[in-house]
Amino acid sequence: MSATGDQDLIQEDQEAPVNQEGAQAEAVGDREGGDSGPDSGNTVAGVAGPMRGLGEEEGEQAAGLAAAPGGGNAEEDSEIRIVVEMVEEEEDEEEEEEEEEEERNEADNFDLVAAARRYPIRGFRMEFLDMVHSLLLRIYHNDHILIRMRGGRLMRRRRTAAPSGSEEPRLLLVHERLGVGAAGPEGEGLGLLQEAALVPEPEVPADLAEMAREPAEEPAEEASEKPTEEAAEEPAEEASEKPTEEAAEEELAEEAAEEPAKEEPAAEEESAEEPATEEAAAPEEVTKYQHEKWDEEAQDAAGKEEKEEKEKDAENKVKNSKGT
């Protein structure tokens, strides 16, 4: 019983100064409540900081100590200081965390800016569009066909124009706006593709008739030259072998030699005019069938000339036999 009684007395002695200090603090607050001096605001501001993290009892004790600094015990002062230091440490930690978060955000933003400077996607997009448009322009204007013919020559044929009802759509509206040789929005040209488009194309003969006429005229000329040479040589030999014949027979032989020579150029002119008229009628459609026709006509003309020469030779021989 004595131990418990002593403990109760000790607790009452410890609580008594606290209650007294609380009463003193209330009295001082009532006194200062009516005052409007500048010190009243400072006292309230000085007490407000420690009272944030304290309970009701600890707040009353801190207020009492602030109002009456001469009262209280050293143990209570140390406890209050510990609590205040803990609160200040927590606030410092929160401020450090906020500063770290801000630094992280700034680092992330810097990375984004560096990536945007290193990879300019806008410029790449414009360059790619310019390249595609230049390719389409090159393909759109490349409207001719190259055909390899005999003799290692190239022939150029234009495509047939589309009918008036079906018009081709216009593809390169962007280049029409910018201009074919205009620079891009960033001051850069179209590059190698633009230079390739400006290179002149090799000149190629466009007349089909001239190219087809050369291989066709050669066999016809050879066939016409051979009978003329033979016909001119034979009468000359006969005239030299028979110098004693009469003048009339010589004149007949000369006339016979001149007639085939006159007829042969006429036949050559006719044979040359016929393919020329055919070429003028259809200069764009040269086929192997026309070559075959020309060969047949040349052969027919050569056969006719040979028959005429044979008939004339037979007549001359008959005349010579009669004269002898």
Curated annotation (Swiss-Prot):
**Superkingdom, taxonomy of origin:** Eukaryota
Compositionally biased intervals (Acidic residues): 246-258, 266-277
**Intrachain disulfide bonds:** none
Q: What would be the name of the gene that encodes this protein?
A: CT47C1
Protein name in the entry: Cancer/testis antigen family 47 member C1
Per the UniProt record, the lineage of the source organism begins with:
Eukaryota, Metazoa, Chordata, Craniata, Vertebrata
Could you tell me where the Basic and acidic residues compositional bias lies?
285-318
- Where are the stretches annotated Disordered? 1-82, 88-107, 211-324
Q: Which family does it belong to?
A: Belongs to the CT47 family.
